[in-house]
Amino acid sequence: MFSTGTVWKNVAAVRQRAPIIHSITNFVVMNTTANALLAAGASPIMAHAPEEMAEMAGIASALVLNIGTLTKPWVESMMLAGMAARERRLPVVLDPVGAGASSLRTTTALEILEKVRPAVVRGNGSEILALAGAAGDTRGVDSARTAHEAVDGARALARRYGAVVVVSGAEDVVTDGDALWLVRGGSPLMPRVTGMGCTATVLVAAHVAVAADVLEGAVTGMAAMSAAGALAARRSQGPGSFQVAFLDVLHSLDLVTVRDEVEVVRA
């Protein structure tokens, strides 16, 4: 069972151990996700040059591959980084942004799944369904499917690739192909701010880097995200002030907030 105590344990561990998260991510969210990692107590590296990927694997605690603004050189860097991480047994978290919206995105995400074998895949309902082989109805990089509509696809994807799959939504779903966990919290403001999904991905990576196992890290990373989002929404007036409030809350997140703002249940 994962409790609020488990969530808090990993929140505190991230602050204490400051895991280095190597993130090859998209132009839209680089600043946002780097600041979120810093606020949570982790240490971001946003390197993407192919020539330094092997060296980055030597110092990182986890790797994030985010396909939001793909180009061929970035695909090369992602594959080099992913293979180096696999060789060193570093956890890799894949964010298949917009999978299903274009063949480049879908084939790249599937190639990473096949060759790198990420520990975690985090996406919205449409992205997960697209990778699972169903019609995901992807609307750009946004989802036309709820997390619950993607449960069967998430389980199938997890079993196929031996990964933990996280489906973000009003209620987040986390599965290793067998167990299914629901994370309840957050705020309707979160989808109104770009980069919140990508932020969830890097927080999951930070938690996986310190957790007892991958499933625990995925659940607690999403729970920390939801708790911070819920409290930040009450302290803000709209999407603009929410972004600032979210970083502040993430930085000062405490056990009381975790206990009061998020619920983690096994389905």
Swiss-Prot record:
Gene: thiM
Pathway(s) where this gene product acts: Cofactor biosynthesis; thiamine diphosphate biosynthesis; 4-methyl-5-(2-phosphoethyl)-thiazole from 5-(2-hydroxyethyl)-4-methylthiazole: step 1/1
Function in brief: Catalyzes the phosphorylation of the hydroxyl group of 4-methyl-5-beta-hydroxyethylthiazole (THZ).
Organism in which the protein naturally occurs: Nitratidesulfovibrio vulgaris (strain DP4) (Desulfovibrio vulgaris)
GO biological process terms, semicolon-separated: thiamine biosynthetic process; thiamine diphosphate biosynthetic process
The keyword Iron-sulfur is assigned to this record: no
Entry cofactors: Mg(2+)
Protein name: Hydroxyethylthiazole kinase
Residue runs in coiled coils: none
Record: residues binding substrate: 46, 195
Family: Belongs to the Thz kinase family.
Keyword Kinase part of the UniProt annotation: yes
